[in-house]
Regions:
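Hydrophobic transmembrane alpha-helices and their membrane-interface boundaries in multi-pass
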Residues: 23-100, 106-114, 128-135
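Alpha-helical transmembrane segments and their helix-membrane boundary motifs
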Residues: 19-32, 51, 120-128, 157-170
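Membrane-water interface at transmembrane helix exits
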Residues: 43, 94, 176-180, 184
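Short helix-perturbing small/polar motifs within transmembrane alpha-helices
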Residues: 110-126, 169-181
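Short, Lys/Arg-rich, polar N-terminal cytosolic tail immediately upstream
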Residues: 1-19
Length: 202
């Protein structure tokens, strides 16, 4: 898995002088595009979930890919990318079984993405919004259960929970791997710069 992460990192970000947060944003946007289109949509089709879930996933994947492409050209829409992911999860919650489904598990990779992509007060605010949003979804599910679709059977619920949690776990691991890869890259760049400066003094 680590080798795959490093290969993906080299493919999506050949630059060596981009800021750390830009590198993370670009790689994560590309990762979301691949996961949504290559993993989530095929899994949803196997589970027979409503077509609207695939529409949300496809839209998220395409726009994320566009954000990654635009970032290569100097436009880094980090906050819109984060907000788009959160809104997509909110929409999917109501049509993918609510608290009985696996949508809330996808808040964990989004939290990992938040930690890697933002810093300081912005990171704290984003994590707070993320937590409050998840609690609000649970409260709506409890107070107005008629607003949320439900699985047709226990088997459907089991399949959704199993595939959703495993996919979310793997995605979280990939996000953390990208964060660590970008951090090591930044450390190596700084060490090379320091060595060059030390050599110039000599």
């Amino acid at each position: 898995l680590h080798a795959r992460v490093r290969q993906w990192a080299r493919l999506t970000d050949p630059e060596t002088d981009a800021p750390l947060e830009v590198v993370l944003f670009r790689r994560m946007a590309a990762l979301v595009a691949v996961v949504m289109i290559g993993v989530v949509i095929p899994t949803n089709r196997l589970l027979g979930l409503p077509l609207v879930v695939d529409v949300v996933a496809l839209g998220l994947g395409l726009v994320s890919g566009y954000f990654a492409w635009r970032s290569r050209r100097g436009h880094h829409a980090m906050l819109p990318f984060w907000c788009m992911n959160l809104v997509s999860l909110d929409l999917a919650f109501f049509v993918s079984f609510g608290a009985d489904g696996s949508v809330l598990a996808w808040f964990y990779p989004l939290a990992a993405l938040t930690v890697g992509m933002f810093e300081g007060r912005r990171r704290l605010i984003a994590l707070l919004v993320l937590g409050l949003d998840a609690l609000a979804l649970l409260a709506i599910d409890f107070a107005r259960p008629e607003l949320v679709s439900r699985p047709a059977s226990r088997v459907t619920r089991f399949e959704d929970l199993a595939t959703g949690h495993i996919s979310a776990l793997v995605t979280t691991m990939l996000v953390v791997g990208l964060v660590l890869s970008a951090y090591r890259r930044e450390q190596a760049r700084r060490e090379a710069t320091n060595r060059a400066l030390a050599g110039s003094r000599d």
